[in-house]
């Protein structure tokens, strides 16, 4: 009898473990590294996370000055596990920036590049890729941009009529030199949902990111939210914080 009881305990424990494993497999992440070719012939490495269901909303992740999608860490996977199709995209200047020996040098280097190419070619190609996926609803795509990525995102949001934008550590009066003011871009973006994020002590905009984001919030019409995280940080650092990740996932679910 005692031996029989142990067998039953072992058997049911096995069933529980098997069920948990089966659920993990069912809800697991289908991750694929893809090479996206832009209209001007550049080849961009990206990682695509397919959704578990059809007609899913999509999210494109645009990196910071480093132009490297890998700096998002586990964020793409967490977004995917929450039900989104996710494309994490490298930007064309990744290899150039990788040679910089400091953050200051990286910023100086990126400022000398053709930044509009990041909108006209890189982001456009990412949007086309994600929109073409049969499991993705092309009318429900959001862009999350961190630091430099937020500048690319706000212009792309207007240019390509993106459903929702998450702009992390955006700062300054203009997205790119000699381009439309951010105030005008926000007006052009219209009533569509926009989330502004920054840290309490964000070094963006020479320490004026907090002041700038409060202005953006005032300028924006329609659906908008301003999320100021505790402590210090900038761009991807903010998004990686557990509370920030949860907040963004919830916000996207409510606005896509």
Task: Identify the function of each model-found stretch.
Residues 23-53:
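N-terminal cap/lid segment of alpha/beta-hydrolase-fold proteins
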Residues 56-64:
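Short beta-strand element of the alpha/beta-hydrolase
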Residues 65-77, 91:
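The serine-hydrolase catalytic nucleophile loop
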Residues 79-103:
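Conserved alpha/beta-hydrolase
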Residues 108-134:
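Alpha/beta-hydrolase active-site loop
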Residues 125-189:
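Primarily recognizes the serine-hydrolase "nucleophile elbow" in alpha/beta-hydrolase
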Residues 164, 171-228:
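The feature captures the conserved acid-bearing segment of alpha/beta-hydrolase catalytic domains
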Residues 221-256:
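C-terminal catalytic histidine-bearing segment of alpha/beta-hydrolase fold enzymes
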């Amino acid at each position: 009898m005692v031996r029989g009881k142990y067998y039953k305990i072992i058997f049911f424990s096995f069933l529980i473990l098997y069920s948990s494993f089966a659920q993990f497999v069912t809800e697991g992440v289908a991750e694929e590294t893809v090479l996206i070719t832009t209209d001007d012939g550049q080849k961009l490495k990206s990682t695509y996370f397919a959704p578990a269901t059809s007609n899913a909303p999509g999210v494109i992740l645009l990196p910071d000055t480093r132009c490297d999608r890998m700096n998002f860490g586990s964020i793409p996977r967490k977004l995917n596990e929450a039900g989104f199709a996710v494309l994490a995209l490298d930007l064309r200047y990744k290899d150039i920036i990788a040679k910089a020996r400091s953050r200051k040098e990286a910023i100086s280097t990126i400022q000398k590049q053709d930044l509009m190419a990041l909108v006209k070619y890189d982001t456009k190609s990412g949007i086309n890729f994600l929109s073409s996926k049969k499991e993705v609803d092309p009318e429900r795509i959001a862009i999350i941009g961190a630091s430099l990525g937020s500048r690319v995102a706000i212009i792309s949001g207007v240019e390509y009529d993106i459903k929702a934008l998450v702009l992390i550590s955006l700062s300054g009066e203009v997205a790119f030199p000699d381009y439309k003011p951010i105030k005008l871009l926000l007006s052009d973006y219209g009533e569509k949902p926009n989330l502004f994020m920054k840290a309490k002590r964000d070094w963006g905009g020479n320490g004026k990111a907090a002041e700038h984001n409060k202005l953006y919030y005032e300028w924006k019409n329609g659906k908008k939210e301003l999320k100021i995280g505790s402590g210090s940080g900038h761009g991807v650092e903010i998004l990686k914080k557990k509370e920030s990740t949860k907040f963004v996932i919830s916000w996207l679910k409510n606005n896509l």
